[in-house]
From Swiss-Prot:
Record protein name field: Cyclic pyranopterin monophosphate synthase
Keyword line: Lyase, Molybdenum cofactor biosynthesis
Assembly and binders: Homohexamer; trimer of dimers.
Protein encoded by which gene: moaC
Residues given in the record as substrate binding sites: 75-77, 113-114
Biological source species: Burkholderia lata (strain ATCC 17760 / DSM 23089 / LMG 22485 / NCIMB 9086 / R18194 / 383)
């Protein structure tokens, strides 16, 4: 692994110059989970949450999160995203919800941060919409699962658990 790219020779933070990089298709997939009480899970599953369609609102929030990443993470480049796909998987065994986001662009830098931000914002929205009945929900295991494109090539998480 190379050194930290967001610091110059003097140790000052800077936005990485991607001007000389090749434009390629960039894809990143991130995943995260929110664990909750069985009663909270049932409200989401059955569509009975007082604030409405929890996963529908969380899907829109995740998409917005991906689009606004450069506004939130200081050294991220603003990107023209070509696709943001959000999937929620209900898991009775936890109980909880998994959020999987795939982000794509055609550009000079990757979209891992956009995918991670989207997952976090989606799961935070689930928390926000359900906190009145379950303040003990836990957001966990947020990670990049796969990235494709760019100079460093393709990468996939070694574990297959998520």
């Amino acid at each position: 692994m190379s050194g930290l790219t967001h610091f110059d020779a003097s140790g000052h933070a800077h936005m990485v110059d991607v001007g000389g990089k090749q434009e390629t298709q960039r894809i990143a997939i991130a995943r995260g989970t929110i664990r909750m009480l069985p009663a909270t899970f049932a409200l989401i599953r059955d569509g009975k949450a007082k604030k409405g369609d929890v996963l529908g609102v969380a899907r829109i929030a995740a998409i917005q999160g991906a689009k606004r990443t450069a506004d939130l993470i200081p050294l991220c480049h603003p990107l023209a995203l070509t696709r943001v796909a959000v999937d929620f998987e209900l898991d009775d065994a936890l109980p909880g919800v998994h959020c999987v986001v795939q982000v794509e662009t055609f550009g000079r830098t990757g979209v891992e941060m956009e995918a991670l931000t989207a997952v976090q914002v989606g799961l935070l929205t689930v928390y926000d919409m359900c906190k009145a009945v379950d303040r003990g929900m836990v957001i966990t295991d947020v990670s990049v699962r796969e990235k494709r494109g760019g100079k460093s090539g393709d990468w996939k998480a070694e574990d297959t658990a998520g």
